[in-house]
Amino acid sequence: MAFLLHQARFYTTVNHLRDLPPTVQPEIAFAGRSNAGKSTAINVLCNQKRLAFASKTPGRTQHINYFSVGPAAEPVANLVDLPGYGYAEVPGAAKAHWEMLLSSYLATRSQLCGLILMMDSRRPLTDLDRRMIEWFVPTGKPIHTLLTKCDKLTRQESINALRNTQKGLDAYRDQGVKGKLTVQLFSALKRTGLDEAHELIESWLRPSVADEKSEPVAQ
């Protein structure tokens, strides 16, 4: 099956909730700390070099960027690139704006069907990552974590990062969280985990045509 994400193009940019497009197509949001490799991961997933742009100044991108996927005449879904978070030098007013924008979007956007959360595999589950999870889990929708830059880890370090992150996510389930919390290793450079991520994302967007033979991700 041709990957749906390979049919992606820029749609629109918004900076306020009131400007969110009145689309009916399902959305998948991509979130992560500044420098977690979010833009690079989106580009690799969509098989494009410059679809999502990384700011030259980390943490300064304050907009929500929409990318439509599927045939240009009749898009079937949207990918939503949320502002990176956690850069220490960002002014307080900007941080407050991001917090309002991100938390409100994640909690209230009815079209949103899941969250892809990027974490640097060398530093997973920071306090800000946990805040993102805690904003979203009340919706009951799934969160899938990509442990990015896993090519920088040894095999044993990768195993430990995956195991420890899954343990941290399991703690939310133990607290009664209903939505699925899954995790995998990912490297845009080595293309590690690319097919696995494709299959999961497309199963959210088009569950009726999801590949039934795909390997399950860690849960």
UniProtKB/Swiss-Prot annotation:
Gene3D superfamilies referenced in this protein's UniProt entry, alphabetically: P-loop containing nucleotide triphosphate hydrolases
Residue span, EngB-type G domain: 24-207
GO CC, alphabetical: cytosol
Keywords: Cell cycle, Cell division, GTP-binding, Magnesium, Metal-binding, Nucleotide-binding, Septation
List of residues binding GTP: 32-39, 59-63, 81-84, 148-151, 186-188
UniProt-annotated binding residues for Mg(2+): 39, 61
Disulfides per UniProt: none
InterPro entries listed in its UniProt record: G_ENGB_dom, GTP-bd, GTP-bd_ribosome_bio_YsxC, P-loop_NTPase
Any one GO BP annotation for this protein: division septum assembly
One of the record's GO molecular function terms: metal ion binding
Keyword set includes Transport: no
HAMAP family: GTPase_EngB (MF_00321)
Biological function: Necessary for normal cell division and for the maintenance of normal septation.
Similarity section: Belongs to the TRAFAC class TrmE-Era-EngA-EngB-Septin-like GTPase superfamily. EngB GTPase family.
PANTHER family, sorted: ENGB-TYPE G DOMAIN-CONTAINING PROTEIN (PTHR11649:SF13), MSS1/TRME-RELATED GTP-BINDING PROTEIN (PTHR11649)
Name of this chain's protein: Probable GTP-binding protein EngB
Organism: Burkholderia ambifaria (strain ATCC BAA-244 / DSM 16087 / CCUG 44356 / LMG 19182 / AMMD) (Burkholderia cepacia (strain AMMD))
Gene: engB
